C-alpha cells in the first residue's frame, strides 16, 4: 500500500488500467476474478445495482484476458495464474447504446466496425449486425489461435430506458437478432460475461444460452463487487482516520457512520457478508463527509417508471418477502415491484427461510433517497415547491427548535390528507402518519412508526444526532393536543429514551379531522 500522502481514491474511475497505472487505491478482487474465470463455466451473468463496480470488474476481466500481468503485480492473482495467455476480447458497453432501435443499431455497428478494422474484416454492404458479430468472433479466434472472451456490460440499459415506450419491442428484437450468435459460436468462445441491473428474459441472452450461469446469488461471488468491512480495514484505514479527524469523530464513530449510511447489502442467502456501496463509500472517504451520493448520481431515475403508487406502498417494502423462484429467475417486467427494487439496489436480502427471501432497505442512504423520490407525488407538488420548507424543517428539528419547525411541517402537510385521492381508503390518522413519516425520512432523519414499548405504542419516534422526538398524533375530534399529551404522560412514553445522551422532546400533535392539515403541536413537559 502506498503512503497515505501519495494515495488517490478512484472516485468515479471504472478503468482497472488507469487505477493501476496511476497508483489509485485498489481493493484487490483478483482472487475472486480468477476463480470466476477458471471454474469451468463459460457463460456467466451478474446482476448488481447501479454504481456498484460492475464496469470496473469488466475492465479487470478484459485486462486479465489481454494477458497484462504487469498491471496485476502485487495482487492475489499472481499467486494463482501460472500461464498468462492472451485471448482476443470483444467488449460491448450497452449503456452507450441509447434507448431506441436506431441508437442500439448505431452503437453496435460502430463497435463492430472497430473490431472489423482490428482483424482486417471486410463485410459486404448491407450485412446484418448478426452476420458481422458472427464473422468477428470466428475471425478473431482463427487469426489469434485463441478462443474469444466476450464481455457485455450494462446489457439492460437500453431495455430499462425504453420500457413502457413504443420503442421497447423494437429494442428487444435487436437483442434477439444479434445475441443469438453467442450460442451459435460456442466453439470459438473462451468466456462470456454479461452484467446488468434488471433481468429481461424475453431477449436471446437468456433464452438461447441454456447454460448461462447466474452468479448473482452465489456465495463465492457475493463480494465480487462492492467493499466489505474487512476490506475497509485492509485498504482504507488512513482515509477512515483522516475522515474522523476532520469531523471530530473517533475511528469507531467514523466506521459506525459509514456503516449506517452505505453498508447493508447482501447478495446470497447464507453466510451473508455485509457489502458497502463502493461509489458512495469512496466518495465519502474522499470528501471526508457523509452525503447521499447514490441518489445524486441518478440512481433513482427509473424508480417511478417500474413501481406504481410507490408513495403509498413504500413503507410496506422495508419488511417484505419474495419467493426464491421469482427473485432468482423471473423477468423484471412481470416479477412485481419487490423484484425490481431488489435488483436495482433499493432493497436487499435480510434473511432466507424455506424458499422465501426476506427483503428490506439496506441502509440510511437508500432509505432517504427513496422517500425523497416519492415525497413530491405524495404531497402532490413539484420538488422545487417543497424543497425550501423541507430545508427549514430539517434545520429547526436538527437544532431542537420544535416550535419553529411546526410552521414548515404545516406547509408541507397542508390539505394533502384530504386532496390526495390515493389515500382515500386509509383511516385519516393513518394518512397523517404516512405523510409525516415520509417527510421525516425524506429529510434524512431516522423514523420508527408505531414503536412498541412496555407501556404502549408510540405513533412515531424521530431521531437526529442530538435529539429524540417522541410524537403522538390525535385528530381534533379525538381530543387533539390534550388527549395526545395525556397519553404521552400516562404511558410514560419518554421513559425508554432517558438513558440516551440525546435530549428527548415529546410532541403532542393535533390534526384536522377532515384532512386539512396540522392544527398545532405542543412540547410536553416531562417529569
Stretches with model-predicted labels:
Residues 496, 500-527:
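Domain-level recognition of nuclease-like catalytic cores that cleave nucleotide substrates
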Residues 178-185, 339-347, 437-442, 487-507:
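Metal-dependent nuclease catalytic cores in nucleic-acid-processing enzymes
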Residues 436, 460-462, 466-477, 491:
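Conserved catalytic cores of phosphodiester-cleaving nucleases, focusing on short active-site segments
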Amino acid at each position: 500500500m502506498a503512503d497515505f500522502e501519495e494515495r488517490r481514491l478512484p472516485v468515479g474511475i471504472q478503468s482497472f488500467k488507469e487505477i493501476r497505472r496511476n497508483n489509485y487505491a485498489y481493493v484487490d478482487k483478483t482472487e475472486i476474478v480468477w476463480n470466476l474465470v477458471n471454474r469451468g463455466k463459460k457463460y456467466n451473468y451478474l446482476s448488481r445495482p447501479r454504481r456498484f463496480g460492475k464496469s470496473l470488474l469488466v475492465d479487470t476481466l478484459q485486462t486479465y484476458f489481454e494477458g497484462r500481468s504487469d498491471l496485476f503485480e502485487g495482487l492475489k492473482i499472481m499467486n494463482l495464474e501460472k500461464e498468462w495467455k492472451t485471448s482476443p476480447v470483444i467488449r460491448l458497453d450497452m449503456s452507450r447504446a441509447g434507448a431506441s432501435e436506431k441508437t442500439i443499431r448505431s452503437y453496435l455497428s460502430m463497435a463492430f466496425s472497430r473490431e472489423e478494422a482490428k482483424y482486417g474484416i471486410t463485410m459486404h454492404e448491407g450485412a446484418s449486425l448478426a452476420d458481422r458479430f458472427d464473422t468477428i468472433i470466428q475471425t478473431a479466434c482463427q487469426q489469434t489461435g485463441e478462443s474469444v472472451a466476450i464481455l457485455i456490460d450494462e446489457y439492460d440499459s437500453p431495455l430499462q430506458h425504453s420500457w413502457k415506450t413504443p420503442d421497447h419491442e423494437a429494442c428487444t428484437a435487436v437483442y434477439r437478432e444479434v445475441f443469438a450468435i453467442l450460442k451459435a459460436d460456442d466453439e470459438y468462445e473462451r468466456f462470456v460475461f454479461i452484467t446488468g441491473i434488471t433481468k429481461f428474459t424475453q431477449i436471446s441472452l437468456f433464452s438461447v444460452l441454456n447454460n448461462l450461469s447466474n452468479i448473482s446469488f452465489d456465495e463465492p461471488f457475493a463480494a465480487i463487487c462492492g467493499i466489505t468491512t474487512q476490506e475497509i480495514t485492509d485498504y482504507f484505514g488512513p482515509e477512515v482516520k483522516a475522515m474522523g479527524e476532520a469531523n471530530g469523530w473517533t475511528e469507531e464513530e467514523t466506521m459506525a457512520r459509514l456503516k449506517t449510511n452505505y453498508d447493508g447489502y447482501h447478495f446470497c442467502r447464507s453466510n451473508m457478508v455485509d457489502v458497502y456501496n463502493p461509489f458512495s463509500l469512496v466518495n465519502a472517504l474522499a470528501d471526508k463527509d457523509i452525503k447521499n451520493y447514490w441518489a445524486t448520481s441518478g440512481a433513482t431515475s427509473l424508480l417511478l417508471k417500474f413501481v406504481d403508487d410507490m408513495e403509498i406502498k413504500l413503507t410496506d417494502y422495508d419488511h417484505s418477502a419474495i419467493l426464491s423462484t421469482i427473485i432468482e429467475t423471473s423477468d423484471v417486467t412481470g416479477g412485481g415491484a419487490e423484484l425490481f427494487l431488489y435488483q436495482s439496489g433499493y432493497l436487499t436480502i435480510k434473511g432466507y427461510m424455506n424458499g422465501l427471501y426476506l427483503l428490506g432497505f439496506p441502509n440510511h442512504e437508500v432509505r432517504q433517497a427513496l422517500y425523497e423520490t416519492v415525497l413530491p407525488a405524495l404531497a402532490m407538488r413539484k420538488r422545487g415547491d417543497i424543497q425550501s420548507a423541507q430545508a427549514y424543517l430539517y434545520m429547526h428539528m436538527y437544532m431542537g427548535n420544535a416550535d419553529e419547525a411546526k410552521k414548515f411541517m404545516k406547509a408541507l402537510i397542508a390539505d394533502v390528507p384530504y386532496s390526495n385521492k390515493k389515500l382515500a381508503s386509509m383511516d385519516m390518522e393513518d394518512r397523517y402518519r404516512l405523510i409525516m413519516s415520509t417527510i421525516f425520512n425524506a429529510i434524512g432523519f431516522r423514523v420508527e412508526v408505531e414503536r412498541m414499548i412496555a407501556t404502549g405504542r408510540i405513533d412515531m419516534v424521530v431521531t437526529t444526532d442530538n435529539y429524540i422526538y417522541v410524537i403522538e398524533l390525535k385528530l381534533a375530534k379525538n381530543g387533539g393536543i390534550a388527549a395526545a399529551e395525556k397519553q404521552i404522560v400516562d404511558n410514560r412514553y419518554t421513559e425508554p429514551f432517558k438513558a440516551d445522551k440525546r435530549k428527548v422532546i415529546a410532541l403532542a400533535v393535533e390534526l384536522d379531522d377532515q384532512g386539512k392539515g396540522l392544527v398545532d403541536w405542543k412540547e410536553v413537559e416531562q417529569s
